[in-house]
Amino acid sequence: MNIKYLIKKDIEQALIKINSNYTYEVFIISSKKIELGHYQVDNLMKISSRLKIKPYKLFQKILILIEKKKIYKKIIFSHPGFINIFIKNEWLSEKLEIPFISSRLGVKYIYPKKNIVIDYSSPNIAKEMHVGHLRSTIIGDVTVRILEFLGQKVIRANHIGDWGTQFGILIAYLEDKKLLKKLKKNLLSLQDLDNIYCQSKKQYNSNELFSKKSREFVVKLQNGDQYCCAIWKKLVSITMLENYKIYKKLNVTLEEKHTMGESFYNPMLPKIVEDLKKQKIAIEKNGAVIVFLDEFKNRMGDSMGVIIRKKDKGFLYSTTDIACLKYRYQNLHADRIIYYTDSRQYQHLLQSWTIAEKANYISKNLLLEHHMFGMMLSKNRRPFKTRDGNTIKLSNLLNESINRATNLIQKKQPNLCKKKLIKLGEIIGISAVKYSDLSKNRNTNYIFDWDKMLSFEGNTAPYIQYAYTRIISILKKSNIPLHKIKMKIILNEESEINLAIKILEFEEIILLIAKNGTPHIMCKYLYQLSTYFSHFYENCSILFSEKIKIRKSRIKLSFLTAKTIKKGLNLLGIKTIKKM
């Protein structure tokens, strides 16, 4: 059910009858003031200008063509040029039956079904995931859930950083410090590897003999040396084992089978370079292989060069990304590829896409989207870091949130048993972190605030979760089985009508996220829905209405609200709580 689309379709068809050459899109928005209508045509003045008909006269022509349709209660003109639309209560009641009986809340599948690759999370090996990985991981996962809900074939791609010079450095350091036995016996944790990586990097930058040895190990690894490959596999295994624990804690759907890291594409790189040279897209210059792109200019106005193979025959990220793109299109048959990386990767991705298209590795019809995102900031509006200036580890952030949530619940419910306290603390703590991030527009930076994200007021996970538990409690107290309520919902009060319309907006929200990858729209919707229910609860007696029909109607409307909240949170990867 998409009310805006139905209104838009009606008005556009009317405009075609008024003028057969009509080709302009009608924009429908939700009214900010309910007394002016439920919906509004936002661009009537532009349309009237193009059709050379005065706004009011155009309104009259449209009105004659659509006013008798079942959906409309009242359609009025507002100066200087707006159409305000009121929806019939009876029509709303009839349409609420669809989400009531449907497990999908009446949301239709999208056809044709498309193959969509979503590139997200992408942690580095031998390094702990930090707060910078949170946004890519959870925003990407919401997009996966939404598109799968709409019936699309989604291919998750966890493009891990598991190849390159850093592995030669790590192997050399582990050998020098006699740490390989510990590694083989699983006595080194990911935290140990993270520290080892930092120390080995310092040694690589300051010790020429060590850096030479590291480069030799890189070459051996690239040539498939068994000794180096065994160490490399162990490093990958230790890292990803910990990362999967974080994914599970975050309720993220990434699994081992979704990992397609840099190493996966490494065997393809020599052929890519040779083919680009053969097609005369790439040239050799000073021992390196470079692609010069006229589409990108440097400060001097010259075509920018993208190096795809270094003088030492080593490959770069750009080479890997070209091979990756070719594989996703030709082997995975992708119709659309979405990348969840920060804004700094934008030019790099555009260059890789341009080269792949020039080489005919991909079709011009392939949809390539970079869903970039901003940074998590501290209250002083600087990158969110520890007091000593280090990047905050994601596992530490999640544990801190669980501890804070547990303490908060314990203060509110001191008699709660330990088992329930631990379970509630984990659900609310993880939900608070996820929702706090997901509720912000991904294109912007946002300030991380413990107090706000764990608050039971405002647009937060605890507020939405509490709204859900309150409705579940009301339904239990009603003692009226929902399957026995055969009557349609009766809508008389303004708060009932507003809640009904908001429930029916669910599909519209789903489609917007599927198109733009912006989960903050769902968060805003769930907050509004919960707030509308609160107004309904305050203004309408649910359990104690004298008329049994009204009582049943309001219980049914309450159930529909809870059902919608649960589905919305589920698509955000956030768990609901039946009792809080």
UniProtKB/Swiss-Prot annotation:
The entry's keywords: Aminoacyl-tRNA synthetase, ATP-binding, Cytoplasm, Ligase, Nucleotide-binding, Protein biosynthesis
SUPFAM superfamilies linked to this entry: Anticodon-binding domain of a subclass of class I aminoacyl-tRNA synthetases, Arginyl-tRNA synthetase (ArgRS), N-terminal 'additional' domain, Nucleotidylyl transferase
The keyword Aminoacyl-tRNA synthetase belongs to this UniProt entry's keyword annotation: yes
Designated name of the protein: Arginine--tRNA ligase
GO cellular component, one term: cytoplasm
InterPro entries: aa-tRNA-synth_I_CS, Arg-tRNA-ligase, Arg-tRNA-synth_N, Arg-tRNA-synth_N_sf, ArgRS_core, DALR_anticod-bd, Rossmann-like_a/b/a_fold, tRNAsynth_Ia_anticodon-bd
CDD domains: Anticodon_Ia_Arg, ArgRS_core
PANTHER family reported for this sequence: ARGININE--TRNA LIGASE, CYTOPLASMIC (PTHR11956:SF5), ARGINYL-TRNA SYNTHETASE (PTHR11956)
Catalytic activity: tRNA(Arg) + L-arginine + ATP = L-arginyl-tRNA(Arg) + AMP + diphosphate
Organism listed in the record: Buchnera aphidicola subsp. Schizaphis graminum (strain Sg)
Subunit annotation: Monomer.
Alphabetical list of SMART domains matching this protein: Arg_tRNA_synt_N, DALR_1
Domain of life from the UniProt record: Bacteria
EC annotation from Swiss-Prot or TrEMBL: 6.1.1.19
GO biological process: arginyl-tRNA aminoacylation
Protein family per UniProt: Belongs to the class-I aminoacyl-tRNA synthetase family.
An annotated Gene Ontology molecular function: arginine-tRNA ligase activity
Localization per Swiss-Prot or TrEMBL: Cytoplasm
Motif segment ('HIGH' region): 123-133
